[in-house]
Amino acid sequence: VSVSDPIGRYVTGLEKEHFKVYEDKVEQEIDYFIQQAAPISVGIIFDVSASMKDNNNIRKAKAAIARFLQQGNPEDEYFLITFNQKTTLVQSFTDQSSTLQSDVAFQKPGGRTAMYDAIYMGLDQIRGAKNEKKALILITDGEDNSSRYSLSEVREFAKESDVQIYGIGEEGRLNYGRYEIQNIVGITGGRTFFPNSFNELDYYIDLIHAELRNQYVLGYRPTNRTHDGKWRKIRVKLDAPKGLPKLIVHAKEGYYAPKS
């Protein structure tokens, strides 16, 4: 779970008693609560389609990714996926951030945009993560026009996955693409950011990095013990300390119960 204020800044310092968790509208007892800068497993999904040439967006995105990697710690791990009309796993999980920086630096833009396929590949790869905290970071300037997978297929896979997705897209270039990204990201408890230009990428990359380091981890044993494979809807409610502005909670929308 992450918490932000009305202008998008992450919020730290909250305690267990400030949170309530509901599963299918039934309040659950929070058995586990922690906030600490734990190691992270991150997949970077990088748009290298032809439109990334415009406004030198490819260079700005490379610099932002390098910035994110340079802020890591030795226990973090990363992989890199690039996409145009083709989706490529450039680097599988590694703790050598310098290797990933080199891979990013050599990317050249061209082709169409298979964003759904790239996210699907990222969701598949993240299953091999070694760390409890997992995230995918999508950087794109457009909308899908070349995928084999559909929006509904990717969204369904995201519902099954224990990972938060963060999406950054350029505001002025996204039409339906904005809806596409929000539709997938929202269900995972991640966040979307739509800066007016990629000149603002560093700010949002820093925000994502800080948020990943300062997330709250809440755990509970469901009162519904039935192993029926059905979707269980989760809602996290915040009772913030007095004096704070209205805060926004970002948490995954639910999970599928195991089957017996």
What is each stretch, according to the model?
Residues 2-260:
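Scaffold/interface architecture of coatomer-like assemblies
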